[in-house]
Amino acid sequence: MRPSRRAPDELRAVSLERGVVKYAEGSCLVKFGDTHVLVTATLEERLPPWLKGQGRGWVTAEYGMLPRATLERTRREASAGKQGGRTVEIQRLIGRSLRAAVDLEALGERQITIDCDVIQADGGTRTASITGAWVALADCVNWMKARNMLKAGVLRGNVAAISCGIYNGTPVLDLDYAEDSEADTDANFVMTGEGRIIEVQGTAEKVPFSDDEFLALMALAKKGVARLVDLQKMAVA
């Protein structure tokens, strides 16, 4: 039995609320159970120097956690003078994941910056961030379309992410903190709306896992991502 009493293939309660920040070109408040992330998408008419003159744009991401997003206060990274390795890893993952869904040439020579700020953390902050970031990105693209800033479609499709793990010997979907901290294995899957894989991160925390166990996790992830994509489509409709 999972601590949350969910079925092995059951997501937490998920909500995707679009347009929550009036100043941003795109925004989304995403909730996976008690994990809440505020995501904004900012359009910038500038590019990294190494991309200038190439006729294509860029999508990048930044990620951070509020000090009391966690059970005990976490020191702000700004006060330490540098970002932690985990933060850098997650924001690069978010950027890579979103670029897989974007036609950068159709975007033109401009940049969209995604900011993911974790308000409350209860496991799965990176997967919630990616899922909500796609909604904020789509919101931003629609903002651009409404102003005739785009000549062609920019988004190739949906991108969503979900965690899976082996908890008490059972493959389960969408781990919360209680499960993640005790799981034998945990993995994060980033996929397209068609179920194609963008990235997989998997670790045997306690016990190495077999091919069959990995395939069971991937099957769960595909089901979970399909549900998340349905919610994304409803959010941007």
From Swiss-Prot:
Gene Ontology biological process: rRNA catabolic process; rRNA processing; tRNA processing
Record: residues binding phosphate: 86, 124-126
GO terms assigned for molecular function: 3'-5'-RNA exonuclease activity; tRNA binding; tRNA nucleotidyltransferase activity
Catalytic activity reported: tRNA(n+1) + phosphate = tRNA(n) + a ribonucleoside 5'-diphosphate
Pfam families: RNase_PH, RNase_PH_C
EC numbers for this chain: 2.7.7.56
Keywords annotated in UniProt: Nucleotidyltransferase, RNA-binding, rRNA processing, Transferase, tRNA processing, tRNA-binding
EC class: transferase
Source species, domain of life: Bacteria
Function of the protein: Phosphorolytic 3'-5' exoribonuclease that plays an important role in tRNA 3'-end maturation. Removes nucleotide residues following the 3'-CCA terminus of tRNAs; can also add nucleotides to the ends of RNA molecules by using nucleoside diphosphates as substrates, but this may not be physiologically important. Probably plays a role in initiation of 16S rRNA degradation (leading to ribosome degradation) during starvation.
Xref: PANTHER family: EXOSOME COMPLEX COMPONENT, EXOSOME COMPLEX COMPONENT RRP41
UniProt similarity note: Belongs to the RNase PH family.
Subunit structure: Homohexameric ring arranged as a trimer of dimers.
Protein name per UniProt: Ribonuclease PH
Gene assigned in the entry: rph
